[in-house]
């Protein structure tokens, strides 16, 4: 074989090998898709900072001067108070009297002595509480919240003893139908006193017994536990001061053992002198908790208009002292309405 022939044979063989290996002018396969690049998450827009809400400044506590001015304004200007003028009023706490005043024509003053009628009831309740060391018996409660059934009391005579008063006319009559039901009256306390060591006492003896136990200086014009005291606003205020100061056991019993009093809304009530209010009665005192008009104060209004009270929180006491020319239970109720206006003005430090 010539050189030319060898060269051609070699080229032919190389071409065949290249074709067999997929080399000559053909494609080597599809181009792979590029790896996707992740889209970055959007940067969150920051929320604006909340606008701070300013804390309201605390309401300043009224000063004693502000409270006194407000109470004086109510005493002289509130319609309920104008209706019962003239009178003397005072408000205090455990430290003593804080404010007072007299309104109306020829009004009484702090030292004016007067009959206080049913304001005597709180005094006897306090006496029994003190004698019992603050732990009343069930029998005590039965008499002192006026559900005992002794409901025919009329009056005592000045020269009687507790026992002879209790036996006088219908005073000691027991009405079985009223037992367990509220009936406002003096027979409950007179019977209780007669049965508990006070039977032989006349006015002076009764005053001595009550005052020795309570640290007070009351006088009695008749031996009636529920209505026989005559005294001044100053003397009664001192008694109330001892209550709110925690010196008398009755303080812890204010509002204790309450009974409903309004016959229109309570089947266990026969008679209440406060028409139109659903208050309660406790140990010788009212709880002024009528849902519509009550403020929860504890009080013992008297028939001639003398009205002592202790605030619901037992921190403040007050007296409205007057002596109506015509006695009647509604005089006490009228004073109670005025007393509420004075009490509210004192608490708020403003009137109206």
Give the residues covered by each predicted segment.
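Active-site SXXK
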Residues: 112-135, 191-196, 315
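Active-site Gly/Thr loop motif
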Residues: 259-320
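A short, well-structured edge-of-sheet supersecondary motif
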Residues: 67-114, 286, 307-311, 315-322
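Active-site-adjacent helix/loop patches that line small-molecule binding or acyl-intermediate pockets
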Residues: 64-72, 137-249, 257
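C-terminal motif of bacterial Sec signal peptides marking the signal peptidase cleavage site
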Residues: 18-20
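Structured C-terminal helix/loop/strand segments within mature extracytoplasmic catalytic/sensor domains
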Residues: 60-69, 294-352
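Bacterial signal peptide processing site
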Residues: 22-26
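Bacterial N-terminal signal peptides that target proteins for export
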Residues: 1-10
């Amino acid at each position: 074989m010539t050189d030319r022939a060898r060269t051609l044979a070699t080229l032919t063989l190389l071409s065949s090998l290249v074709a067999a290996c997929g080399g000559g002018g053909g494609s080597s396969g599809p181009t792979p898709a590029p790896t996707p690049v992740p889209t970055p998450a959007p940067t969150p827009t920051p929320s604006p900072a909340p606008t701070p809400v300013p804390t309201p400044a605390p309401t300043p506590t009224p000063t004693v001067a502000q409270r006194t001015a407000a109470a004086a304004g109510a005493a002289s200007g509130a319609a309920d108070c104008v209706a019962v003028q003239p009178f003397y009023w005072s408000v205090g706490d455990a430290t003593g009297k804080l404010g007072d005043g007299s309104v109306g024509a020829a009004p009484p003053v702090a030292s004016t002595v007067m009959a206080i009628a049913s304001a005597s009831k709180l005094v006897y309740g306090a006496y029994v509480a003190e004698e019992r060391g603050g732990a009343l018996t069930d029998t005590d409660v039965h008499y002192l919240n006026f559900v005992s059934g002794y409901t025919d009391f009329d009056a005592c005579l000045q020269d009687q003893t507790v026992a002879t008063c209790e036996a006088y006319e219908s005073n000691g009559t027991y009405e079985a139908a009223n037992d367990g039901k509220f009936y406002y009256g003096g027979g409950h306390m007179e019977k209780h006193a007669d049965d508990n060591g006070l039977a032989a006492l006349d006015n002076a003896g009764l005053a001595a017994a009550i005052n020795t136990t309570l640290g007070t200086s009351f006088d009695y014009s008749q031996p009636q536990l529920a209505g026989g005291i005559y005294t001044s606003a100053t003397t009664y205020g001192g008694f109330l001061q001892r209550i709110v100061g925690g010196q008398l056991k009755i303080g812890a019993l204010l509002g204790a053992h309450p009974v409903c009093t309004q016959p229109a809304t309570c089947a266990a009530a026969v008679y209440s002198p406060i028409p139109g209010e659903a208050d309660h009665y406790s140990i010788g005192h009212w709880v002024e908790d009528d849902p519509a008009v009550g403020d929860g104060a504890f009080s013992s209004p008297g028939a001639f208009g003398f009205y002592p009270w202790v605030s619901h929180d037992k921190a403040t006491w007050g007296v409205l002292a007057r002596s109506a020319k015509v006695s009647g239970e509604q005089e006490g109720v009228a004073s109670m309405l005025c007393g509420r206006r004075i009490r509210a003005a004192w608490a708020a430090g403003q009137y109206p």
